[in-house]
Amino acid sequence: MPAWLTNRTIYFLCFLAIAGLMGFAFYLQYVKDLEPCPLCMAQRIAFVLAGLVFLAAALHNPKNTGTTVYAFLGWVTTLGGAALATRQLWLQSLPADQVPACGPGLEYMLEAFPFSEVLTMMLTGTGECAEVQWTFLGLSIPGWTLVAFIGFTAVWAFAWVRRPR
């Protein structure tokens, strides 16, 4: 392993990768006019939280116990995001007659419903979450986000195993 490839460098590179993923998400939304569904928005939140944990770890450069704490927080955010992506992939695999009904837009939900109901609707997904709007190499957007979340989870495992003792 090169000497320059410290945990701090890895954390910062992961933060930059997540910033790039968020930039690509906004590109798909605002340039390609792909409207994100509630589960997509929840996955974005998970990416932002994971990115903030990576940034905090890069700035703090934790040692033994600190690395364990950051790894735990990182695992919570990345595994939570992976669960959301898996849920959306499951919705996309349903036959058309089993897809849940489409719900209102997120802005309307935030204005009209209590936050607990909005959160439930975001995490369970609606009919628009089952729509495949874009693919690359045979994987839809939630497929690629699942790959990214698994990769970031592995980075936290690597950092935890490699932590200074």
From Swiss-Prot:
It comes from the Bacteria. Keywords: Cell inner membrane, Cell membrane, Chaperone, Disulfide bond, Electron transport, Membrane, Oxidoreductase, Redox-active center, Transmembrane, Transmembrane helix, Transport. One of its GO terms (cellular component) is plasma membrane. GO terms for biological process: protein folding. Residues 28-45, 87-143 are periplasmic. It is a multi-pass membrane protein. GO terms for molecular function: electron transfer activity; protein-disulfide reductase activity. The chain crosses the membrane at residues 11-27, 46-62, 69-86, 144-162. Residues 1-10, 63-68, 163-165 are cytoplasmic. Gene3D superfamilies: DsbB-like (1.20.1550.10). It is found in: Cell inner membrane. Disulfide bonds join C37-C40, C102-C129. Required for disulfide bond formation in some periplasmic proteins. Acts by oxidizing the DsbA protein. HAMAP family: DsbB. Belongs to the DsbB family. PANTHER family: DISULFIDE BOND FORMATION PROTEIN B. This is Disulfide bond formation protein B. It comes from Hahella chejuensis (strain KCTC 2396). The gene is dsbB.
